[in-house]
Amino acid sequence: MYLGTQFAARTDSDYETFKQLGVNNINGFPETPHQNWTVENLIQYREKVESYDLKLDMVQLPLSSKDIDSRVKSGEFYNILTGISPERDYEIERICKIIEMCSKAGIPAVKYNLNIIGIPRTESESGRGGAKLSTFRWDKADHDAKDTYAGKVSEDVFWERIDYFLEKVVPVAEENKVRLACHPHDPYTPPGYKGVTRVLGTVEGLKKFISIQENDYHGLNFCQGTVTEMMDNPGEEIFDVIRYFGNKDKIFNVHFRNIKGSKLSFTEVFPDEGSINMYEAIKVYKEVGYKYMLSLIHI
């Protein structure tokens, strides 16, 4: 277990800063658009990271946390979650190709999201030292917000689309020995919000997710902050959830984030002031033998 970052380097000097701050491992973002990724330019990117005495632990697949409407405009993959064929089959084929290229380029893991409505938040609130805190208050959210490009997506439909994706992608990951780390839905929202029932927004949903296409290379980008946002009493509940997924070796990356509050009403805060005892959390990650990055994010 070690500290890492997923902060996207703005210039080459940021890589130097990472090293100066004691960060040795990163989740990277190749500089070439994903449509143009090749084994050669992925190797070049990894070697560039390594030239700063850093290790490239994983890269982000073109399945981000952005809402699907934004991805439609930007050209990022979205049909995997609309279920439209043959377009989704092309996207899945490209994801499989990227996994193969990462393996050949010496990149051991990838992270991704299966997100339709993005990361809902309400108005920011002020925190320590005047910091603006990312906030979600369900009682202040627009409960009548319109559906996304994806339209109505029920629980059963969402699971069907996830299963379709995993059935094709997980065997490729296993064959190429590349870990797939999926981020939960941030935050939990009541069923039908913006037309979607978010199946990866509960602990039970995450348990079901890892049981689909059970495989050593199929697991979670375990965002501790997001998981605590699913809980009524996160300060007590989170540790057993870490144990559950950690003992199954399903945690491939940790977003080491804290919140103040609980399900449907919280702010993201500095690590030392939230509802979770972060020192105790680290001890649990050690207890279960977690061996990858702890990334401080959203601060």
Predicted feature residues:
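Short, acidic/polar
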Residues: A8-K19, I92-I99, E237-Y244, M278
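Active-site-proximal loop/turn and secondary-structure-junction residues that shape catalytic pockets
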Residues: A9-T11, T32, P62-S65, L114-G118, ...
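Conserved, mostly hydrophobic/aromatic
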Residues: F18, I26, C102, H183, ...
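Gly/Pro-rich active-site loop or hairpin
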Residues: N36, P191-K207, T226-K291
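Active-site acidic/histidine proton-transfer and metal-coordination neighborhood
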Residues: Y78-G219
